[in-house]
A protein has these predicted regions:
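Conserved class I S-adenosyl-L-methionine
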Residues: 1-42, 56-60, 78-81, 140-177
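Acceptor-substrate binding/catalytic loop of class I
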Residues: 144, 148-153, 157, 183-197
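Class I SAM-dependent methyltransferase SAM/SAH-binding core
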Residues: 48-50, 54-101
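Short alpha-helix
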Residues: 179, 190-214
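A short acidic, Gly/Pro-enriched loop at the edge of an enzyme's catalytic core
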Residues: 102-110
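A short glycine-rich, Lys/Arg-flanked "PGG" loop and its adjoining helix->strand segment in the class I
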Residues: 124-139
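A short SAM/SAH-binding and catalytic strip from SAM-dependent methyltransferases
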Residues: 110-123
Length: 247
């Protein structure tokens, strides 16, 4: 199966970096707080960060007491930034695709992945490798784009009133699990759509029990500052899952 490395495209990389630096950033407002709310006590834990990107979270995990962190990413450009800006003696960065986790010969107490799995074709294979890397009773915590977003395959995403206000989401082809190419900074960015049931069943089949799922929504403080995020009550942007290894 093909491994996607869109982040080493110079145009994509610069566009993505600019997006993550903006104050009005859905990742910082919703996804990251939700992800951190699912974390257990990190003191003394061995952590694997899949798709670690710039490495900010790897550094956060060390500050929170982790014994060691291994961050992997397929993007050399991302890891250059991680090593320059978020290095630590307890952090190891490895240039590796998630599909190749089987080459890692270590054991971890916690595996974390932030917004990477919807770029992966072999979801089931990656989950099995994660389970193999986890210690007994270890946890896998991840975020991804909502399946209500990954099912989108063109046309008008929203029905709007005469003033352009969003009335409701136009949901189509939710049950058609597929690869979809879209334009995001550059053309040809591939995402893989899976239904909620597929995500849960794949986790169970890989030896996990699902303990919690979160679809973060804006609070009143965020809405007062960024009223456009009202549309998240129609369609949350993110899905987060906390799963425990049970076999």
């Amino acid at each position: 199966m093909a491994k996607q490395n869109i982040f080493d495209n110079e145009v994509f990389f610069e566009g993505y970096k600019d997006l993550r630096n903006r104050e009005k950033n859905a990742n910082n407002l919703f996804e990251i707080p939700a992800l951190f709310s699912l974390l257990p006590e990190l003191k003394g834990l061995r952590i694997l960060d899949l798709g670690c990107g710039f490495g900010e979270h790897c550094k956060d995990y060390i500050r929170m007491g982790a014994e060691k962190v291994v961050g992997i990413d397929i993007s050399e450009k991302m890891l250059e930034v991680a090593k320059a800006e978020n290095s630590d003696p307890k952090i190891t960065y490895i240039n590796l695709a998630m599909e190749d986790l089987n080459v890692i010969d270590e054991e971890f107490d916690l595996v974390i992945s932030s917004l990477a799995l919807h770029y992966i074709e072999d979801f089931d294979g990656v989950l099995k490798n994660i389970n193999n890397l986890l210690a007994k009773d270890g946890y896998f915590i991840f975020s991804q784009e909502s399946p209500l977003s990954t099912c989108f395959s063109g046309g008008e995403r929203w029905t709007r009133d005469e003033n352009g206000n969003k009335l409701h989401l136009n949901l189509t082809n939710y049950g058609r699990e597929k690869e979809a190419s879209s334009e995001w900074f550059v053309e040809g960015v591939k995402r893989y759509h899976r239904m909620f049931s597929t995500i849960v069943n794949s986790l169970v089949d890989a030896g996990f029990s699902v303990e919690r799922m979160v679809e973060p929504l804006p609070n009143e403080e965020i809405l007062a500052k960024y009223p456009d995020y009202e549309d998240l009550f129609h369609k949350p942007d993110f899905l987060l899952v906390k799963a425990k290894k049970n076999k």
